[in-house]
Regions:
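N-terminal cleavable signal peptides for secretion/export
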Residues: 12-82, 99-108, 165-166, 170-176
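Short, hydrophobic/aromatic-rich segments at coil-to-beta transitions
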Residues: 22-29, 57-64, 89-97, 120-121, ...
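Hydrophobic/aromatic beta-strand elements that line small-molecule binding cavities or substrate pockets
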Residues: 46-52, 81-86, 109-113, 183, ...
């Protein structure tokens, strides 16, 4: 999408982006549901917070997303995920960590971003369930993001003029790999929240490339206003 080309390009200088959507101190909470035989069943909760902090002594945004399955859901499948990221105040990714306990497995994925000489340098780390560690370093030619960083940046995208099917392409990383990913605009819709309020929202699909095809990982909704609250 030409509209967003300045946000995700090969020039590291343009990895910077202006935040227009959130302020330090934002806290959001959610209920988690699972669709079981066409019935939505509450299985846990999630919370997301963003504050201005410091990373290696420099001002940065610190954002975390914590998901927890309920005691009843734990009888079938335990989920304890904690995602953390740091971004510069110009929205450049600096650090990402995902600690995931899913079932009887626990893994840690990390990504460290730096920009020596205006070039992107990426260091990845994974701690596997058996306790072994894997490290990898690379120099991507494009602005590269983690799951939380691209989510924060997307909130400041200007959707004016978007049409259904418009896509934003970008590389995404975790602790082991860098893969092509896409945000696809699905149009506007009205969402009724648990508090009974209805919100006019933009509908977006996050997809990752798998076996040559893009597969939807998650579909999310953000308010159709300047804050784009998820």
């Amino acid at each position: 999408i030409l509209l967003l080309a300045a946000g995700v390009t090969t020039s590291t200088a343009q990895c910077k982006f202006r935040n227009t959507a959130f302020k330090s101190g934002e806290y959001l909470s959610y209920n988690l549901y699972f669709n079981w035989k066409f019935v939505w069943v509450k299985v846990g909760n999630a919370s997301m917070s963003t504050v201005e902090s410091k990373y290696h002594g420099k001002p940065a945004y610190r954002s975390s997303l914590i998901t927890r399955s309920s005691a009843n859901a734990d009888k079938f499948f335990v989920m304890r995920d904690t995602l953390l990221c740091y971004n510069s105040l110009q929205m450049e990714p600096l650090y990402f960590r995902k600690g995931a306990r899913e079932g009887d497995r626990y893994t840690v994925d990390e990504a460290f971003f730096s920009y020596p000489g205006g070039k992107t340098h990426l260091k990845q780390h994974q701690q596997k369930n058996n306790g072994t560690h894997v490290w990898h370093e690379s120099k991507p030619t494009e602005c590269t993001f983690d799951m939380l960083s691209i989510f924060l940046r997307a909130r400041s995208f200007n959707p004016e003029g978007w049409k259904k099917g418009n896509r934003i392409h970008f590389p995404i990383t975790d602790g082991t790999k860098v893969i092509p990913a896409v945000l696809e605009y699905k149009g506007k819709t009205t969402v009724k929240a648990d508090n009974g309020h209805k919100y006019r929202c933009l509908q977006l699909s996050y997809m990752e490339k798998e076996n040559g095809k893009y597969k939807e990982i998650v579909r999310f909704y953000v308010t159709d206003d300047a804050n784009h609250v998820p």
